[in-house]
Design a protein with these regions (language model features):
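Active-site nucleotide/adenylate-binding loops and adjacent lid/helix of ATP-dependent enzymes
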Residues: 74-163, 167-185
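ATP-binding N-terminal substructure of ATP-dependent carboxylate-amine bond-forming enzymes
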Residues: 1-83, 102
Length: 185
């Protein structure tokens, strides 16, 4: 069997019930991260909203960390993620990087006239998103996402959205699970 340790800033994290030990500290507490890493044979991340600096500290401890800091950094920024995917030949919906509300109108024309404004960071399950169907909606959409750096993604026809989870072993073997369908209200 495995002895599972978790590291999180909350003392009452749900995973604590199944863990042998819960390390409670801020994600940027380098000393606590090093102590945690020294107690582990391998470390994995539950989600992508952990500071990259935390993964850098763990990686420096020479404990296998999956995903590593580079993958974590890419997954935290929608523009970086799309550029990476396009760069390795995986197509995405057309998009434009948005730094200010004044960028939206020209970007809207380039993506076909209708799009979804999405924060570059910290967005999930519809959080940090606003539709832009006409140039007059740009300011409202920008305000709705908190005036955060964003991408404007073209509205494209699709049948459904799925999430694909793939695991890869250290020797390169991959395994995937049946993809669940995502339904957003």
């Amino acid at each position: 069997g495995f002895d599972v340790h978790i590291f999180c800033p909350e003392a009452d994290a749900p995973a604590s019930r199944a863990a042998r030990k819960t390390w409670v500290a801020d994600y940027l507490d380098a000393g606590a991260l090093r102590d945690f890493a020294s107690s582990c044979d391998v470390i994995t991340l539950e989600f992508e909203n952990i500071p990259v600096e935390a993964s850098d500290v763990i990686a420096a401890c020479q404990v296998p960390l999956h995903p590593g800091p580079k993958s974590l950094a890419i997954s935290q920024d929608r523009a970086e993620e799309k550029a990476f995917l396009n760069g390795i030949g995986i197509p995405t919906a057309p998009y434009e990087v948005i730094a200010a509300a004044s960028d939206i109108q020209a970007a809207l024309e380039r993506v076909g006239g209708t799009g979804i404004l999405k924060t570059r960071r910290d967005g999930y399950d519809g959080k940090g998103q606003a539709w832009v169907r006409a140039p007059g909606e740009a300011e409202g959409a920008w305000s709705a996402i908190g005036e955060a750096p964003a991408i404007l993604e073209a509205a494209i026809p699709f049948e459904c959205e799925i999430s694909v989870i793939v695991a890869r072993s250290s020797n390169g073997q991959t395994l995937s699970w049946a993809p669940p369908r995502n339904v957003h209200e």
